[in-house]
Amino acid sequence: MHMVALTDHNTAANAPAFRIACEREGVVPLYGAEATSSEEAHVLGLFGAPEPALEFGRRLYESLPEAAFDPVRYGDQVVVDEDENIVESLSRHLIGGSAFSLSELGRLIHELGGLFVPAHVDRTMFSVWSQLGFLPPDSYDAVERTAEAGRIDTGPFCVIADSDAHVPEHIGRRYTTFEAEAPSFAALKTALEEHRAFPHGIRSVTQLAEPQS
């Protein structure tokens, strides 16, 4: 792997530790968050530096309901340093929907200089397909799929694939390649604009009926 993105749900608070960890391992980091729109569709906001990602995460987090989070029921929501020491516990439930609509998330991401990518658009939960039934017209930088075809028309947008890993063992199960002199956020942005990024590990048409992970 040459580039790795950290996109926690509705927060980017772990971006500083992630930057240091990637520097240690010689991997180019992408920063961001997997936002939940007010329609309850997941959206990736990807950035080339921690600062805009942190601002994106701050606005997302502040828009979440203030209802108390139950760590016993749902597990801990922690911010760590580069040595995995816990420095903060987040009190708002990160799985909930933000106050931003899909289009509002796109404007915010672009305002901060990021890439606006609807996540796993063909899944049966928390996707534009499951929530809206179609991909609304908008200024997406790419569209993330888990299968080659079926369910939803992704239009003219570049299709990518990502691990969507919630445990280490799932990292790299799906991934995207693109040609560049060196891996960087700018090179990725150009590759998406020119449709020179290619998804790997997504399911074939014959696998569509199989359970999703």
Which stretches of residues belong to each language-model region?
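Ser/Thr-glycine-rich phosphate-binding loops at phosphate-binding pockets of nucleotides
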Residues: 5-7, 11
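Active-site gating loops and adjacent loop-to-helix segments of metal-dependent hydrolytic enzymes
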Residues: 48-91
